[in-house]
Design a protein with these regions (language model features):
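Conserved beta-alpha-beta core of the PfkB/ribokinase-like small-molecule kinase fold
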Residues: 90, 94-171, 193
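Residues that scaffold the ATP/ADP-binding catalytic core of kinase and kinase-like folds
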Residues: 65, 158-159, 250
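Structural alpha-helical scaffold elements that stabilize or flank donor/cofactor-binding regions
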Residues: 83-84, 140-141, 178
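Conserved phosphate-binding/catalytic region of the ribokinase-like
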Residues: 162, 166-270
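Conserved N-terminal subdomain of the carbohydrate kinase-like
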Residues: 13-95, 112, 116, 266-270
Length: 270
């Protein structure tokens, strides 16, 4: 939802695809989406609406306790979803939503249904939470994406799982980029900056120093701003710069979906 919300702030027609339960929490989510004017394809299923307990450590970094056997583990592939896939230019998917075979199958069918078109983005934003990932799921997602978003901690875990050599994080990124024929690989390193790798080039941006309210949603806003910029035809350095600025702003706000300042929203029209 965070990614779709921020993409919509840059003028794109976005949709959240998921499932909620036939319960009060499901009603609340639908109401929040209405308030945010966030378009969606949320199926109501006979499972409880998903919940996550989020606590912040002393540095403001979120820790997650994600409940299992919930609605978003059971997203059905509907005719409406098939129609959406056929008209989608960019999609962002993660590893957490694939922990159950039902939603995993739906995500893969959606990716396979998307028609090949110039400039299309299939963004795999890895989110390694608790024990909700496997080597098999990660490998299949690497194969189906053309943009990989990963942070430095996740890169170390992936490197151990897949046996990628080398100490330097950049070396590992080049290996992933080449092995899976990616258009782009985005590596975020917290306060140590971020990188965007493309075949033969790398962009680096420092992380701005800002007063942090919390970091929930900052990574999603980074991905959304970057991909929106690329879809608008901006260069990789331009897209990277805006992504860093948007993410920094979100860190100064409480909650994952603040309204972005007009100056940031209008940058893609320059």
């Amino acid at each position: 939802a965070n990614f779709a919300y921020h993409v919509s702030q840059f003028g794109f027609d976005s949709r959240v695809v998921s499932a909620v339960g036939n319960d009060e929490l499901g009603d609340e989510i639908l109401e929040i989406f209405r308030e945010k004017q966030l378009k969606h394809q949320l199926e109501r299923v006979n499972y409880p609406t998903g919940t996550v307990q989020v606590t912040l450590d002393n540095g403001g970094v979120p820790c997650y306790d994600i409940k299992e056997g919930v609605a978003w583990d059971n997203i059905p592939f509907t005719d409406d979803l098939k129609r959406l896939a056929l008209s989608t230019r960019a999609v962002c998917f993660g590893s957490l939503a694939q922990r159950d075979e039902v939603s995993r199958a739906t995500i893969n069918r959606f990716l396979d249904t998307m028609p090949d078109m110039e400039g299309q983005l299939k963004i795999f934003d890895i989110n390694l939470r608790q024990n909700f990932y496997t080597k098999e799921v990660l490998r299949e997602s690497f194969r189906k994406c053309n943009v990989l978003k990963i942070n430095d901690e996740e890169l170390i875990i992936i490197s151990r799982m897949f046996g990628y050599p080398g100490i330097d994080l950049q070396d590992k990124c080049w290996i992933l980029l080449a092995k899976y024929n990616l258009k782009m690989l985005i590596l975020t390193c917290g306060t140590n900056g971020s990188y965007v790798f493309t075949p033969g080039t790398v962009s680096f941006q420092e992380t701005p120093k800002v007063p942090v309210a919390d970091t929930v949603g900052a990574g999603d806003s980074f991905t959304a701003a970057f991909c929106s910029s690329v879809l608008k035809g901006k260069s990789i350095p331009e897209a990277h710069r805006l992504a860093v600025e948007v993410s920094a702003y979100v860190c100064t706000q409480s909650g994952a979906m603040p309204v972005l300042p007009e100056a940031l929203r209008n940058r893609l029209n320059d």
